[in-house]
Swiss-Prot record:
Enzyme Commission identifier(s): 5.2.1.8
Domain PPIase FKBP-type: 161-246
Compartments reported by the entry: Cytoplasm
The entry's keywords: Cell cycle, Cell division, Chaperone, Cytoplasm, Isomerase, Rotamase
GO terms, molecular function: peptidyl-prolyl cis-trans isomerase activity; protein folding chaperone; ribosome binding
Cross-referenced NCBIfam families: tig
Protein name, per record: Trigger factor
An annotated GO BP: protein unfolding
SUPFAM superfamilies on file: FKBP-like, Triger factor/SurA peptide-binding domain-like, Trigger factor ribosome-binding domain
Catalysed conversion reaction: [protein]-peptidylproline (omega=180) = [protein]-peptidylproline (omega=0)
GO cellular component, one term: cytoplasm
Length: 432
């Protein structure tokens, strides 16, 4: 076998491989003999059919099959010999393939980039300094009360924090448009659900009031036919309701299954907030470390890996919305390409950190991660046992631990300082 390696643009490589004719003919002859021995032919006893007849009937098909198998096998031998690490499946192209002649074929593929980490000492990370304060707990309790609130008719004007039930009809240049009409539409004021200017027109109005407002649809509005258009809405206020909050008492506490009355609920809420805060701090530090790593290391990315990641993201998107990945229409690549490339880059760079630092998943860290995750469940012991009894889940947690260790290795060389945050300030920066 002869092999030549050609370096194309970027990460693309082309191997040209020559396989001696004798190898091909031996493989073709062996397969034809196998067919003659094991298949039945009309007019002949099994295994007694003339080889010329078998070759005439099956020769070309066998030769094509042999070519495919030979190209795959010799490609693998070639990349092992040349110490090449392909990043995806090759594209084979026969250059010369005729009976009695050497097989010459090319294999085009991409390789993984050679990553030489740099600039870790220029990565800037601000560690959040934050705690759960009494006022944060009080605000969370108020949120829980709002979640359990009811609405009651009131002789009041619509304002932020009230709920207005309205009928409306929208028109553009005097013509009603699709989706611009509703009856008994509940609108919680101050939530920003409607286009700019819509709620402003309703503020100060009471049940029975009728009005017409002029608004403009935003240029980025989701409906193409409405983007940037001026519209009029005829609105009738059916009713205005005030929010009624439940008392913070034992009856309210019972809805959440907390023990120890109001103080017990406060303690449980604080505990949950502190757990979420610890994760948010970890996420914020990790985000900065990885962003810095990516900014300091510009690498080529194999398109084959991006393609694979796009497909993963597509499937996740379909599943997230309750669809079937096999039957759902294929979502546009553009929706996922940027995120897919980012994930591939991060994976390659973190992989190089792990390799260069010779990191192995720390068993104690794996155990701590499982315990931390399990603490959010009603029976943590049961969750821990489930993980420890499932090798796939354990491997997932080992990968998480290894990634955290890689981030710690980056932080050890980075410029790390501290920055004060409020609870809500930090939590609002977390991805949805």
């Amino acid at each position: 076998m002869q092999v030549t390696v050609e370096t194309k643009e970027g990460l693309e490589r082309v191997l040209t491989i020559t396989v001696p004719a004798a190898n091909i003919e031996d493989a073709v002859s062996a397969e034809l003999r196998n067919i003659a021995k094991n298949r039945r032919f009309d007019g002949f006893r099994k295994g007694k059919v003339p080889m010329k007849m078998v070759a005439k009937m099956y020769g070309q098909a066998v030769r094509n099959d042999v070519m495919g198998e030979v190209m795959q096998r010799h490609f693998i031998e070639a990349i092992v010999k040349e110490k090449i690490n392909p990043a995806g499946a090759p594209t084979f192209t026969p250059v010369e393939f005729a009976e009695g002649k050497d097989l010459v074929f090319s294999a085009s593929f991409e390789v993984y980039p050679e990553v030489a980490l740099q600039g870790l000492d220029k990565v800037v990370v601000e560690k959040p300094q934050v705690e759960v304060k009494d006022e944060d707990v009080a605000e969370m309790l108020e949120t829980l009360r709002k979640q359990q609130s009811t609405w009651a008719d009131a002789d009041i004007a619509a304002e932020d924090g009230t709920r207005a039930t309205i009928n409306f009809v929208g028109s553009i240049d005097g013509e009603e448009f699709e989706g611009g009409k509703a009856e008994n539409f509940p609108l919680e004021m101050g939530q920003g659900r409607m286009i700019p200017g819509f709620e402003d027109g309703i503020k100060g109005k009471k049940a029975g009031d009728e009005l017409t407002i002029d608004v403009n649809f935003p240029e980025e509005y989701h409906a193409e036919n409405l983007k940037g258009k001026a519209a009029q809405f005829a609105i009738k206020v059916v009713k205005v309701e005030a929010r009624e909050l439940p008392e913070l008492n034992d009856e309210f506490v019972a809805k959440f299954g907390a023990e120890g009355g109001v103080e017990g609920l406060k303690a449980e809420v604080r505990k949950n907030m502190e757990r979420e805060l610890a994760q948010a701090v970890k996420n914020k530090i990790k985000e900065q470390a990885i962003n810095g790593l990516v900014e300091q290391n510009n690498i080529d990315v194999p398109s084959a890996l991006i393609d694979q990641e796009v497909q993963v993201l597509r499937q996740q998107a379909v599943q997230r919305f309750g669809g079937n990945a096999d039957t759902a229409p294929e979502l546009p690549r553009e929706l996922f390409e940027e995120q897919a490339k980012r994930r591939v880059v991060v994976g390659l760079l973190l992989g190089e950190v792990i390799k260069s630092e010779e990191l192995k998943a720390d068993d104690e860290k794996v155990k701590a991660l499982i315990n931390e995750m399990a603490s959010a469940y009603e029976d943590p012991t049961e969750v821990v046992a489930y993980y420890e009894g499932n090798e796939q889940m354990m491997n997932n947690m080992r990968n998480v631990a290894l990634e955290e260790q890689a981030v710690e290795a980056i932080l050890a060389k980075a410029q790390v300082s501290e920055k004060a945050f409020g609870f809500n300030e930090l939590m609002n920066q977390q991805p949805a």
